[in-house]
From Swiss-Prot:
ATP binds at K526. Residues 797-865 form a coiled coil. It comes from Thermotoga maritima (strain ATCC 43589 / DSM 3109 / JCM 10099 / NBRC 100826 / MSB8). Its EC number is 6.1.1.9. This is Valine--tRNA ligase. The gene is valS. Signal peptide: none annotated. Catalyzes the attachment of valine to tRNA(Val). As ValRS can inadvertently accommodate and process structurally similar amino acids such as threonine, to avoid such errors, it has a 'posttransfer' editing activity that hydrolyzes mischarged Thr-tRNA(Val) in a tRNA-dependent manner. It holds the Pfam family Val_tRNA-synt_C. GO terms for cellular component: cytosol. GO terms for biological process: valyl-tRNA aminoacylation. Monomer. Belongs to the class-I aminoacyl-tRNA synthetase family. ValS type 1 subfamily.
Length: 865
């Protein structure tokens, strides 16, 4: 039979098999049969993939390989995202480091040339990284959000939405990043708690000794104030409404207006209104027809409207203005104040609300069908709780600002006529104005938000706007696997665009995967230095152990706490699979498959367990319960197959039953490797190819089917009893400090074991002799009790009974103290309510384990009395 080296070496087999699969074209669909399609969430071209990508790709590949083995015509489309703001930032840093120049110094054309070189380099690297993970994507269909086909799709969508009145240009308050010098959508702003100050400032009433005290966290913005607002029902200020105030330091006259937006409980109940630099103030200004004065430039420095403060950074201006307010008697007091402040999701700079001309998508008309699809179950979220998160956001959806002040990205397809002012919006480049015929045109300088092109990903990657065969066959896709952090950025927008342009959902199921945290539960970040590089893990442990680790930890609705020790544990599992296969292969010299007749209880038991495992793993994968599927096959292979069946088979391989045992070993190993294949593709291919039943590739082998005729509940019950007897004997040895190699005599009461069972007991339990008794003999310890059946281990001549009794009492005392401690902990309401769920569960498990051990020792002690 085929030989297998003594050591499992992942590096040796991984490159070999991936190349083989690609050459054979296994990842390219054939276009016949029931289809299953999925698009990869495209990684950004800003560097190496991280552990979140590794989890995302692993989970997708598990489903894809499973579906392929189930006979589906599978298409998994790979690709990368141009990642506008992130890539531009990275290239700008690279330029400064390597050439000491800014993008403005080299100009748009040269900057884009360098960025394309960057993009191509990182796309190649990402491709190799995805291959290293074992992802069975169809590389012949790889796409990029800036490639020609997708660019055509982006332009078509922009133009069509514009013509329907769903894209418009307007002056609105936007989130401005002074570092990236671009607008950000609401979803690109990360809110963090800031310890700040609340400044109380007097605003004098014109021609009066009266004044209103206003509380603000941003005194620097008062340079742009155009009113003070109070609540219409606030009795304190009823006589002030309609009066004119003099703006401190500036001298501008501003009105007092009544508006229901104002919270009378905040500060003094009177708020300054700065319409050009606060979204809520902007709405107040619209309701009261107030002017809007911009005071910041694009760098968040005070502009010419700020008088003597012109040129100061916003924080410098705050310091100077507070000092001047104090000196001139306007500052009443300063209080400590904690509040939420928006930051740029890319560079962490505090964003500046800014009045700006931008392009927007009117989302409410698009959201209607996207809401209905999830409400009526046409699109399902896994775990189900994300449905509510999605719907709550969609019900309150705001218009989407899609223009970005960047160079890298899809340039907005709008040309402004410099002669007549007409906006030419077109899918093709415009040479002359459609209104006046002038050739004096200027294209909009801005690019589209990265998420605009990503929103078209499920259909643009399949060839839209062309009516391709791929589009007809593989749209809508079946599954999207993604993180919760981009439900609004990406998932919701894909659903809206899918219904608008394809008149159909983009996918049926959305699986929201876990966040990968470090072993302490902290988010992985550069600042903490706690990230784990998946490629380094692959180098050290192999892709398969890493994939299996991520899968077995991927419980729905619970973040992953990733301890690097897990990789070592599942590398040991890979070694176990390797060694078990090696054992089977070494015992197949004269292999001859025989009918499954004259099976012994142990054979019926393993075949029953196998078929139940097939059913459990299949059901788990159908419901995206990756951890349950992985844990089930792990337990079956390690415990049932290796620890019990292989051990039980060793003496039988030397008897006339050899061919039958070989047949069962091969059958179980073959099915196990196929069940494991979606999780550990490289290892399973290497091992499966050595089996006498192997075909061309495990990648295209059939998924194991449940053979119900091989399920024997009686045999399972009988062998389970036998296993529990053996475990009981092992436990007695362990508690009595006897080596597991110590052969012992066992007495059984209330049950006559068969010849086969006696042989198994002796083999598996290292038992010298099995005798049958009517009552418990002296100097024995109870190993097993089930209804009328009991088993005892003969300890005569093996231990000093008095010493053992003392030792056991001491151990029991320690265990009781631990039980008391754990019970006290669990009785503490604060601990149960405030500690993480997994910590509480772990404490309960420890308590149960200690109680069980104490009961076991009490039983043994009674036996020794």
């Amino acid at each position: 039979m085929a030989e297998l080296s003594t050591r499992y070496n992942p590096a040796e087999i991984e490159t070999k098999w991936y190349r083989y699969w690609e050459e054979k074209g296994y990842f390219t669909p054939k276009g016949v049969g029931e289809k299953f399609s999925i698009v990869i969430p495209p990684p950004n071209i800003t560097g190496r993939i991280h552990m979140g990508h590794a989890l995302n790709i692993t989970l997708q590949d598990i489903v894809v390989r499973y579906k392929r083995m189930k006979g589906y015509d599978v298409l998994w489309v790979p690709g990368e995202d141009h990642a506008g703001i992130a890539t531009q930032n990275a290239v700008e840093k690279f330029l400064l480091q390597t050439q000491g120049k800014t993008r403005e110094e080299i100009g748009r054309e040269k900057f884009l040339e360098i960025t394309w070189e960057w993009a191509n380099k990182y796309r190649r690297e990402i491709r190799e990284q995805i291959k290293a993970l074992g992802a069975s994507v169809d590389w012949t269909r790889e796409r990029f959000t800036l490639d020609e086909g997708l660019s055509r799709a982006v332009r078509k969508v922009f133009v069509e939405l514009y013509r329907k009145g769903l894209i418009y240009r307007g002056k609105y308050i936007v989130n401005w990043c002074p570092r990236c010098k671009t607008v950000l959508s609401d979803e690109e702003v990360e809110h963090k708690e800031h310890k700040s100050k609340l400044y109380y400032v007097k605003y004098p009433v014109k021609d009066s000794d009266e004044y209103i005290v206003v509380a603000t966290t941003r005194p620097e913005t008062m340079l742009g104030d155009t009113a003070v607002a109070v609540h219409p029902e606030d009795e304190r200020y009823k006589n002030f409404v309609g009066k004119t105030l003099i703006l401190p330091l500036v001298g501008r006259e501003i009105p007092v207006v009544a508006d229901k937006y104002v919270d009378p409980k905040f500060g003094t109940g009177a708020v300054k209104v700065t319409p050009a630099h606060d979204p809520n103030d902007y709405l107040i200004a619209q309701r009261h027809n107030l002017p809007m004065i911009e005071i910041f430039d694009d760098n968040a420095r005070i502009n010419e409207n700020g008088g003597k403060y012109k040129g100061l950074d916003r924080y410098e201006a705050r310091e100077k203005i507070v000092k001047d307010l104090e000196e001139q008697g306007f500052l009443v007091k300063i209080e400590d104040y904690t509040h939420s402040v928006g930051h740029c999701y890319r560079c962490d700079t505090v964003i500046e609300p800014k009045l700006s001309d931008q392009w927007f998508v009117s989302t409410k008309p698009l959201a209607k069908r996207a809401i209905e699809a999830v409400e009526n179950g046409e699109i399902r979220f896994f775990p189900e709780r994300w449905t509510k998160v999605y719907l709550n956001w969609m019900y309150e959806i705001r218009d989407w600002c899609i223009s970005r002040q960047l160079w890298w990205g899809h340039r907005i397809p709008v040309w402004y006529c410099q002669d007549c002012g007409h906006l030419n919006v077109s899918e093709e480049d415009v040479e002359k104005c459609e209104k006046c015929g002038s050739t004096n045109l200027k294209q909009d300088e801005d690019v589209l938000d990265t998420w605009f092109s990503s929103a078209l990903w499920p259909f643009s990657t399949l060839g839209w706007p062309e009516e391709t065969e791929d589009l007809k066959r593989y749209y809508p896709t079946d599954l999207l696997v993604t993180g919760f952090d981009i439900i609004f950025f990406w998932v919701a927008r894909m659903i809206m665009m899918g219904y608008e342009f394809m008149n159909d959902k983009p996918f049926s199921h959305v699986y929201i995967h876990q966040l990968v945290r470090d072993k302490y539960g902290r988010k992985m970040s550069k600042s903490l230095g706690n990230g784990i590089d998946p490629l380094e893990v692959i180098d050290e442990y192999g892709a398969d152990p890493m994939r299996f680790t991520l899968a077995i930890l991927a419980a729905q609705g619970r973040d992953i706490k990733l301890d690097p020790r897990y990789f070592d544990a599942y590398k040991k599992f890979a070694n176990k699979i390797w060694n078990a296969t090696r054992f089977v292969l070494m015992n197949l010299e004269d292999y001859k498959e025989v009918p499954l007749e004259n099976l012994k209880t142990v054979d019926k038991w393993i075949l029953t367990r196998l078929n139940k495992t097939v059913e459990e793993v299949t059901n788990a994968l159908e419901n995206y319960d990756f951890n349950i599927a992985a844990r089930t096959i792990y337990n079956f292979f390690w415990d049932d197959f290796c620890d019990w069946y292989i051990e039980a088979s060793k003496p039988r391989l030397k008897t006339e039953e050899r061919n039958l045992v070989q047949t069962v070993l091969v059958k179980v190993l073959d099915a196990s490797l196929r069940l494991l294949h979606p999780f550990m593709p490289f290892l399973t291919e290497e091992l499966w190819q050595k089996l006498p039943v192997a075909g061309e590739s495990i990648t295209i082998a059939k998924w194991p089917e449940i053979e119900r005729e091989l399920i024997d509940e009686t045999a399972e019950k009988e062998f389970t009893r036998l296993m529990n007897m053996v475990r009981g004997v092992r436990n007695v040895r362990a508690e009595m400090n006897l080596p597991q190699s110590q052969r012992v005599k066992v007495y059984i009461k209330g049950y006559e074991v068969t010849e086969e069972e006696e042989l198994l007991l002796k083999t598996l339990g290292n038992i010298e002799e099995v005798s049958f008794v009517n009552e418990k003999p002296p100097k024995t310890a109870t190993a097993y009790v089930e209804e009328e059946i009991e088993a005892y281990v003969d300890l005569g001549g093996l231990i000093d009974f008095e010493k053992e009794k003392e030792r056991l009492k001491q151990i029991m005392e320690k265990i009781q103290k631990e039980i008391d401690r754990l019970e006290k902990k669990l009785a503490n309401k604060d601990f149960v309510e405030k500690a993480p769920e997994e910590v509480v569960e772990e404490t309960k498990e420890k308590l149960n384990t200690n109680r069980e051990r104490l009961a076991r020792l009490e039983s043994i002690l009674r036996d020794l009395e």
